[in-house]
Amino acid sequence: MKFAWIRPNGTWNDRKEAIVDSLESGFDHIMDLDNAETIKKLGSVTIISDKEDSDITLLGLNNKITMADIKKAQESGKEVAAYVEINNKDDELLVSKLGTVADYVILKGKNWKVIPLENIIASLQNRTSKIIVDVPNYEEAKLALETMEHGSDGVLLSSNDGNEIRKLGALIEKVSKESYDLKAATVTKVESVGIGDRVCVDTCSMMNVGDGMLVGSFASGLFLVHSETLESEYVASRPFRVNAGPVHAYVMTPENKTRYLSELEAGDEVVTLNSKGEANTVIVGRVKIEKRPLLLIEAKYKNSRIRTLVQNAETIRLVNDKGEPISVSKLKVGDKVLAYFSEAARHFGMAIEEQIIEK
């Protein structure tokens, strides 16, 4: 997931305005060497600096550093960001070494046309650190994040310009969007199975018709369970909510990871997406677990057979192959519903290559 840090400059009033713009644009990592305590009065902020009161330790801003310097700084328990100005091949070699130990490597180039940034990033494919490019404006941030085949993980915008900061916020949201290749699975079973503990996920975002969450009993496939965006004769719409399924079910979270529905709580992040597979990351505001009658749904796509359980109610919907919500009370064998399939198994929510049987 792409990200940005902001480095304001000038007088405190200039910096203050830029920091407020940053927070309002979703950026809470600020590089500032002088005003950590004052900045933190403006909001919940992570400070990157070379001072002891920093949250992330900055090394190399004014001097060359070594791998030993990084390791020593990490003994404090803080993350370490290594700042390297690229002027020659020796600097490129230094970056390749620091990238194996530092948590972040910030690259500053005086002339990327002479020393191509893309080549440096491509040489760091085995790195453990996040690569950040120091940029003076939005256009160079866009180049670093979006244009190159091997873009950086993030950017450090050294600017006080509120318009530039807000444009960068919109860009980060755009390039960080995930997408999922949804398939039309054929329903093979719809069966009432009795009472169980079902989870409603209330988010901090309003969803639209066609939006939902990926939920299912198997790691190999998750159904697109529709949000409560439609009115019914029984209840008003709740466009921030997905009545997702029972406590054991997987739900998709950012970076293609899953959580159990029962694990979710306020402040966690989950993925919502539309029928085209275009995804957004949203914040969980509340989770409700209640005993409700459940319905078992099974579907098949090619050689993959998947299952999920949902509350047995007219207001619970999946999404059909036309991108339209369909109530589970009307679902029948032979209907087509959208689902996401994966050949990977799951270990602590992460996709892994492992043979696994789910039934």
From Swiss-Prot:
NAD found in the keyword field: yes
NCBIfam families: PRK02290.1-4
One Gene Ontology MF term: 3-dehydroquinate synthase activity
Function: Catalyzes the oxidative deamination and cyclization of 2-amino-3,7-dideoxy-D-threo-hept-6-ulosonic acid (ADH) to yield 3-dehydroquinate (DHQ), which is fed into the canonical shikimic pathway of aromatic amino acid biosynthesis.
Entry's EC annotation: 1.4.1.24
Protein name: 3-dehydroquinate synthase
Family: Belongs to the archaeal-type DHQ synthase family.
HAMAP family per the UniProt record, alphabetical: Arch_DHQ_synthase
Keyword vocabulary terms for this entry: Amino-acid biosynthesis, Aromatic amino acid biosynthesis, NAD, Oxidoreductase
Gene: aroB'
One GO biological process term: aromatic amino acid family biosynthetic process
InterPro entries the record matches: DHQ_synth (IPR002812)
Catalysed reactions, semicolon-separated: 2-amino-2,3,7-trideoxy-D-lyxo-hept-6-ulosonate + NAD(+) + H2O = 3-dehydroquinate + NH4(+) + NADH + H(+)
